[in-house]
Regions:
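ABC-family P-loop ATPase nucleotide-binding domain
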Residues: 1-13, 310-311
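ABC transporter nucleotide-binding domains
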Residues: 7, 14-207, 214
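Residues that form or flank phosphate/diphosphate-binding pockets in enzymes
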Residues: 72, 113, 216, 239, ...
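Conserved protein kinase catalytic domain
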Residues: 78, 119, 222, 304-305
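ABC transporter nucleotide-binding domain
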Residues: 176-265
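Short, charged/small-residue-rich alpha-helical element at the C-terminal edge
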Residues: 226-311
Length: 311
């Protein structure tokens, strides 16, 4: 086991009845790293978080946090980690300040002792310190939950979908806060269904139905996308999607924002040029007069789609 890694997982399996929640998960997360688990609902992200925070036992495999076994050393792990679950779980009938004081007391510390760690976050919620947590906005609840998870200065911070249901401005602010926390040496493991947030991580694991599809830096994952990616647009987008999928040269095609993202079976440069020309002719024959076809760079979401069995 590599001691430079704060989190180690080897062959982790977890089933809920007939549902395979986690299937042979092996990961190493380095000390001081901001690592992202990226995937849709049902990918296994929350189950993995619960195992690492000692709230759930794996069916098989081994996992350690800070060199401590998640089964044998669960008490010590709980003292060393901070956990912000996906659902707001603070005491809604306590005020902001009362929640912070309560969690500080649980860990035998005070707000003042670790104020330097939460200062940037606390100054944003301090004007509401007498307001009950249940009356806060989504963004303020998020900041309060993060402050409570940090109040004892954990070595590792687990954040389970912290930006779900939060407005875009608060999402950006939250990731900026994570960058500042990383600079203080805290190892951060964050999960999110938002593929666009992957670029804020040092490394990411793309997850689907309990499996890790790929683990690398965001740039590394994008570099594995080997096919030409085309963005195709028209006024008749619904009909266009069906026709693009029926085109003989199509490898994959899916709706993506205001365009359809298309990859081709042909991969050689000369062959692609010929197929694109054939695609234009094909669409003209289908009656399209306003189609635009643009070559684009793949996003993390495109890479995720390319890893799907049905893609």
């Amino acid at each position: 086991m590599n001691k430079s890694n704060t989190i180690n997982l080897s062959g982790i399996h977890k089933n809920y009845g007939k549902v395979n929640a986690l299937q042979d998960i092996s990961l190493d997360i380095k000390s001081g790293e901001l690592f992202g688990l990226i995937g849709p609902d049902g990918a296994g992200k929350t189950t993995l978080f619960r195992i690492l925070t000692t709230l759930l036992l794996p069916d098989s495999g081994k996992a350690s946090v800070c060199g401590l076994d998640v089964v044998r050393d669960y008490r010590e792990i709980r003292r060393r980690v901070g956990y912000m679950p996906g659902r707001f779980s603070l005491y809604q009938d306590l005020t902001v300040e009362e929640n912070l004081t309560f969690f500080a007391t649980v860990f035998n510390t005070t707000i003042e002792e670790n104020y330097d760690l939460i200062r940037d976050i606390y100054i944003q919620i301090e004007p509401f310190k007498t307001r009950k947590a249940g009356k806060l906005s989504g963004g303020m609840k998020q900041k309060l939950a993060l402050s409570c998870a940090l109040i004892h200065r954990p070595e590792v911070l687990f954040l389970d979908e912290p930006t779900t249901g939060v407005d875009p401005v608060s999402r950006v602010e939250f990731w900026d806060m994570l960058d500042r926390l990383k600079q203080q040496g805290i190892t951060i493991l964050v999960s999110t269904p938002y593929m666009d947030e992957a670029s804020r991580c040092d490394r990411i694991a793309l997850m689907r139905t309990g499996k890790c599809l790929s683990v690398d830096t965001p740039a590394g994952i994008r570099s594995t996308f080997s096919r030409l990616l085309l963005a195709v647009r028209s006024a008749s987008m619904y009909r266009l999607l069906e026709d693009l999928r029926a085109f003989p040269g199509t490898y994959s095609c899916y709706a993506f924002g205001d365009a359809h993202h298309l990859t081709l079976k042909e991969e050689s440069d000369a062959g692609v040029s010929s197929v694109v020309s054939g695609l234009e002719t094909y669409l003209q024959a289908k009656g399209y007069t306003d189609v635009s076809i643009e070559s684009i760079k793949p996003t993390i979401e495109d890479c995720f789609m390319a890893l799907q069995p049905e893609a």
